[in-house]
Amino acid sequence: MCIRDRDLHADQIQGFFEKPVDHLYASSIFVPYIKSLNINNLTIASPDMGGSKRAYAYSKFLDADVVICYKQRSKGNVITHMELIGDVTGKNVILIDDMVDTAGTLTKAADLMIDKGAESVIAICTHALPVSYTHLTLPTILLV
């Protein structure tokens, strides 16, 4: 028997199991979907530094630019500062994340990108945890 999972939050999680773990990547599903959207001026974004390798991999698959958000937290889910590394002016941005908890990081990143001149922002996430998303401002961010 083998355990299969998609986009583990950290590769080290594989070592927590006594059984073998197949770490599968959601890019095998998301990349063809993104290509089917035929988006012009595409840029791939990570909402935090931890997802930069993932965003870079997607950007290579999709022949797109990549931008990354740098965030600072004071505690827990409280973001005190966020900066964008890269240019999104006139771009259609796909924000890739592995896990959504409160969606605070995603919404702050999407709002920042719109403020910096992005035409649109779409968020694509592997794992959405069952919490309330009632605070989302949904023309700003679309969760796929």
What function would you assign to each model-found segment?
Residues 1-3, 134-140:
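Conserved small/polar residues in nucleotide/adenosyl-binding loops
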Residues 4, 9-35:
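Active-site-facing substrate-recognition patch
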Residues 5, 46, 95-99:
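Generic enzyme active-site microenvironment
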Residues 17-19, 62, 117:
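Short, structured coil segments at secondary-structure junctions
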Residues 23-27, 31-33, 37, 49-93, ...:
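Short, glycine/charge-rich flexible loops or terminal/linker lids adjacent to PRPP-binding catalytic cores
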Residues 45-52, 127-131:
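Active-site glycine- and acidic-residue-rich loops that bind
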Residues 95-97, 102, 124-126:
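Thr-Gly-centered strand-to-loop micro-motif
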Residues 110-133:
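Helical hairpin unit composed of two closely spaced alpha helices linked by a short loop
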